[in-house]
Amino acid sequence: MTFPDSKFASVADYAVAYFDQAKAAAQSVDQEKLEAALTCLDAAYERGGTIYACGNGGSAAISNHLACDHSKGGQTDTDLKPKVVSLSTNMEIITAIANDISFDDIFVYQLRTLAEDGDVLLTISSSGDSENVVRAARWAKEKGLDVIAFTGFDGGRSTKLATVNLHVEGDNYGVVEDTHQSLMHILAQYIRLKRMDDGTIQERKF
């Protein structure tokens, strides 16, 4: 059953139902795969690899936010120097590729220039089936890069291309994106947290 499937009497009623959906979506995340995603990111950071993230629309916003929180947050109060790039952020490059080549190639075209052995691609797509995301994931897999996929709905083609698929059970874009945003924050904050001194943790707001 899709959500919503009917009108609600008030915004308060809709909020209650929405938060119920959000709770179920969060609880659907496979904890072992969350640990696997953490291990993948940790290993890349420790060996000096770069994390590339990409997504469209709301997922592009999460990709950009990920670059901020992992890059700035990850090195605050730690000895880590995370290298993180959102492929969704440079509109000049994106529109040039989309206009001259294809919108389907806006991410993979950048990866071909930037990515190196030991890097990681993190894709964000509610459907898991956005063509430009799928092309980037396929290229990364073929080149031996680890791929972490944030997916929702039925997972799409990204499911089979990912080294680690963090799937959210849900069919509402807002609910899935909210959960993807939370997963991004959880990973970013934990990567920082595990490297901080105990005393410093209590002095900081996360």
Describe the residue ranges of each PLM region:
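Generic N-terminal amphipathic, Lys/Arg-enriched alpha-helix
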Residues: 1-28
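A short, well-structured juxtamembrane/interface segment
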Residues: 29-47
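Buried hydrophobic positions in well-ordered alpha/beta secondary-structure cores of metabolic enzymes
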Residues: 40-41, 55, 70, 107, ...
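Glycine-rich, small/polar surface segments that engage phosphate groups of diverse ligands
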Residues: 43-115
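Short glycine/serine/threonine-rich phosphate/pyrophosphate-binding segments
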Residues: 59-64, 129-136
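A charged, well-structured terminal subsegment
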Residues: 113, 176-206
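Short, glycine/polar-rich helix-capping loops at beta-to-alpha or helix-loop-helix junctions
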Residues: 150-162
